[in-house]
A protein has these predicted regions:
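Serine/threonine-rich low-complexity intrinsically disordered regions
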Residues: 24, 74, 99-100, 111
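N-terminal amphipathic, basic helical "cap/leader" segment at the start of enzyme domains
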Residues: 1-93
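Beta-hairpin (beta-strand-turn-beta-strand) motif
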Residues: 55, 98-102
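Small-aliphatic-rich amphipathic alpha-helix that forms the alpha element of a beta-alpha
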Residues: 36, 101, 105-117
Length: 117
């Protein structure tokens, strides 16, 4: 537990993203898979999923995001939004997190007493 607390305390967000990384895509994928496997979950249901996007797929995610936000963010405020999206697009890749709702639903059915939680 102490090492986990130390890791959290030492964590810092890197706001300057870029494409220069020291790991290969395969190494990144392996490390992310290992982390996802070990992340605790309620009832150990392991419903968390991750999609890793690199290259053209990464670029497409941020282009779609930018064009979607352009439709809803007021024009006078869009420059700030665009700068933030462009900073994300400058990264080497994108990690998309989601929950597999089929796994969650199955767990709710197996444990109806706790389904609302």
């Amino acid at each position: 537990m102490e090492s986990l607390i130390k890791a959290y305390a030492a964590r810092r967000t890197n706001y300057t993203l870029g494409k220069n990384v020291s790991l290969s895509q395969e190494e990144i994928i392996e490390k992310v898979q290992a982390v996802v496997k070990e992340i605790p979950s309620a009832f150990n249901m392991q419903s968390g999923r991750i999609i890793l996007a690199f290259g053209a797929k990464h670029d497409a995610i941020w282009q779609i995001t930018k064009e979607t936000l352009r439709k809803v963010v007021p024009a006078e405020a869009f420059a700030k939004t665009e700068a933030k999206i462009d900073s994300f697009a400058a990264a080497y890749g994108t990690v998309l997190y989601y929950d597999d709702t089929a796994v969650v639903k199955a767990m709710q059915e197996q444990n109806p007493l706790y389904a609302a939680n």
